[in-house]
Amino acid sequence: MDNLEVKATETESVAEDRVIQARGVWHRPNVTGEETNLEGICSVLDTLQKTGVNLVFLETFYHGMTVYRSSLIPYYTGFDKFDYSPYPDYLSAFVAEATKRGIEVHAWVEDFYIGVDENYFTKYLSQWLMLTKDGAIRQSEGQEYGGYLFLDPANPEVRQYLVNFYHELLTKFPDIAGLNLDYIRYPVSSRYDDTGYTEVAMNGFAEEKGFAFPENATREEKVAMVAERYNDWVNYRAGRVTAFVGQVYDMVRTQHAGVLLSTAVFPEQGKSFGDKKQDFNTWLARGYLDIITPMAYYDDIGSLKNALEGMLPGLSACYCYAGISPTYHNLSNERVLQQMQTTKDTGADGFVFFGSQSILNAPGYIELLEQQFQQETAPALLPHADVQKLIEATAANVEKMLTQAGEPAEKVQSLLQQLQTLSADADDRDVQKMQQVQKQLRLLVRYNLGNFVTEDNLELAKEPLEQLLRYISVKADRLANKTDPGEETPEPDVPATQPEQQPTEPQQTQPADPKPANLARTLGLGAAIAAVAATCAACIHAIRKGRKKK
């Protein structure tokens, strides 16, 4: 790691005047090796807290296993040997201790990817596995590890089983505030190394497109008939992923009101749709997502800026917490701060570091982030916090800035009175009240602010109020959508088949990191490909210790 001695004063603090901001991290349980007991969990959380983190996407379903004692999914290999007393398991301990520290926890779940080793699903539910064009369960993606294993998104039983698992998870852990869907896609593939050719998928596709396979058709004949309709086949598979997102949304909306649904996606819609069958624009249009976490894993600032600016115009009813990876790629302190600042400058509502190990294992980065946020009198609020808290925090910040700028006291108090009136009228649960507050704040910011602030300080007051308007507008639009969800999730699903064998801990040991840093393949920009490929080559030894997420 270079340039770890850069002083915080050499780069403007990204925390300046930002009292509302998501500062998140994706965290794999025990990624540093110290979370084998409660003391280790507390140590990790204390470090994250002092680096300004207010949101943790905690890896909860990965390699086909989980980190709590579920009735549907096996407990992760080795965790039964750890003692988290007085808590019964890792997840119980982490969520409780994070909540004590004011850190919000969302469950990060890897929907269809189930690892590289034989496991519970391959042993007891092999009929649910994704098949390539040639009928293999090993995908071309992840060939360096023998090929990834995926569940089949086109299988209604797969989708329902996962929905049932997420319902169990959210029921057992009411303090988990959100569900972050990762691997919400098919394996990376193209026309020439295609995948998804299960009997369920091919039969469903034929039915949807209105053609029939010949009686006694062989698998090869069915594959050929499907493959010759390639564009429709891409659309069909993307539709199955969208159906799953809709099912999860419906479950959360009807049974876990208040839980936030988010997805980790690549920012390039064209490649995401064609290569991964990931149609996030439709998810946004249907109002499924409360938060989107675009994985903008670029090293250079220009590419990061372009990626975020390309997405943000379509996110009027969805928070954007931008995924960045400067610490994972061992970038300089200056570049880390630049990336954090770029997320703010482009209009993102916050940032999420991938991944926690690249901070927890680097004292220089810990010191850098601690310096950035040490002057704060209180941790930053999350943009999706209660509306009264958002208004109160904004009012206090505006008062501080205007007073320091010499704004007359009577002007400041007049503006604060306007904000207090808005706070009294707001209610996160009442769509009409939220829309009225949205309207009044818009009038104040866009047309009437000059009545309460002198011209010299107009822009100073306007920036935090515009941010507040953004957060309240998302809330109002989300609330309206959940009150009247519009288009229903397509196609009904059947109850999941329950295997005869209940989940037990697999005997195989999963690698610490079965996933390669595959940014060069997925980012899709020529210049970025070369740069990222070089970074990946340099990091290849470290990958097994700190997984590069999809």
Task: Please describe what each predicted stretch is.
Residues P485-A520:
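C-terminal low-complexity, Ser/Thr- and acidic/Pro-rich disordered "stalk" regions positioned immediately N-terminal
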